[in-house]
């Protein structure tokens, strides 16, 4: 039986969203976000494939924050399951108050809107800044909360970061991100829970990007036909189940 590790790529741009699982094409395009210096902006991404196994809870997650009047308000719309994010690509961030903001995660209920709270924390949000919160298999960790500090770009530039969001891969956790077109690694030896900073990069025109075991040619996941647009900032997210093997690729 051919052994294929079931990992996936998301190429999720801040301004253009591109979702890919192996060889899927571009699906969504989003407009640039208008930013107010009085608010902060948050996106939540569910990349925990083993959420139900680890928590024994239904995989229908809500993220809520405390408003200025002390009430909790949902960040997301419909509940999130694995491989979902909110806002979707056509609406890139949720605007909420700045400061030290208590947040909680709950399970969307049938009778009650939020029947079970399973995690509480506080986030420090700076005015006018954008953030991404990745819900991983370490569901009670705030380690994957990042400021999306993108550089100022000209129309002939892009910025790019790589996010390693697979926490349940026991063998060879660190990975490289390889560009077929350039025949070279873009990033090397990236550990789980790490997001590189946004870096200015040349355009990618119909390139294939491959996640490989660090220091080897062993392929774990790929995205085919990646073409970028000048003036945009891209997040490429490596997520999925690092322990699952199967005879066919998904």
Positions of predicted regions on the chain:
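Sec-dependent bacterial lipoprotein signal peptides
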Residues: 1-23
